[in-house]
Curated annotation (Swiss-Prot):
NCBIfam families linked to this entry: cyt_b559_beta
Record organism: Crocosphaera subtropica (strain ATCC 51142 / BH68) (Cyanothece sp. (strain ATCC 51142))
Superkingdom per UniProt: Bacteria
Oligomeric form and interacting partners: Heterodimer of an alpha subunit and a beta subunit. PSII is composed of 1 copy each of membrane proteins PsbA, PsbB, PsbC, PsbD, PsbE, PsbF, PsbH, PsbI, PsbJ, PsbK, PsbL, PsbM, PsbT, PsbX, PsbY, PsbZ, Psb30/Ycf12, peripheral proteins PsbO, CyanoQ (PsbQ), PsbU, PsbV and a large number of cofactors. It forms dimeric complexes.
Gene that produces this protein: psbF
Record has Amino-acid biosynthesis as a keyword: no
Cofactor note: With its partner (PsbE) binds heme. PSII binds additional chlorophylls, carotenoids and specific lipids.
Name of this chain's protein: Cytochrome b559 subunit beta
Length: 44
């Protein structure tokens, strides 16, 4: 997948502060949305 001879990332630094901020918000959000959606179908 890496076609360059150098190991420098050309224009895609993946692990950035933006990536960290997006994932610290997105991972619990997806978890809680799935948990709340599952709670809607629990019958007592």
């Amino acid at each position: 997948m890496v076609n360059n001879t150098s190991n420098q990332p050309t224009s895609y630094p993946i692990f950035t502060v933006r990536w960290l901020a997006v994932h610290t918000l997105a991972v619990p959000t997806v978890f809680f949305v799935g948990a709340i959606a599952a709670m809607q179908f629990i019958q007592r």
